[in-house]
Amino acid sequence: MKLTVLGGGGVRSAFLAKSLAYNAHRIGLTEVVFLDNSADNLAIFGEIARYVFNTIRPDIQFSTTTDPVAALQDANYIITTLRVGGDESRIRDERIALEHNTLGQETTGAGGFAMAMRSIPAILRYCRLIEEHAAEDAILFNFTNPSGLVTEAIIKSGFKRRVYGICDAPSELIRELPAILGCEERDLSVECYGLNHFSWFTHFTVRG
């Protein structure tokens, strides 16, 4: 089972590698490829990810590449975590928005819209490559922000694979709530709407 990460040269690569390594047995993962368009970033963060796999799951075949076709060939799972324009573009987006007294955050408001304008064309190009080279039953997990807009664009493009838009912001809050409410996480029931950094909870219930 092959998993490909698009944007594998980012600063969070080591954390993603650790999570994948510890949970590989759940999906029968045998091969992981981290793709990035920056060989310099892969030489740093990709190699850290390699060390993680070699330490935790040395039996898994791990590689890095700047070649999207090689990365996506026969991939069963694809995770996208792109930052088109790099951190410099994020800084520019947020500062321009703040200068006009509007929200500069990268998933909502003017900053989020600017990021969507860069992210969507790049993601759709990768989607075409996924259709051409990945396994027929491949599943795409989109972490690229703004996740809601990007995932909607993928679906509306006619993408012929399953796709899920993912964000860990709501789940992080759920993990913090038990300490606030004085209960165990298993005793907590929540109702959450929205996606990404623009989600909200309507109510929390402890033990029913």
Task: Label each region the model flagged.
Residues 3-32:
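N-terminal Rossmann-like dinucleotide-binding module
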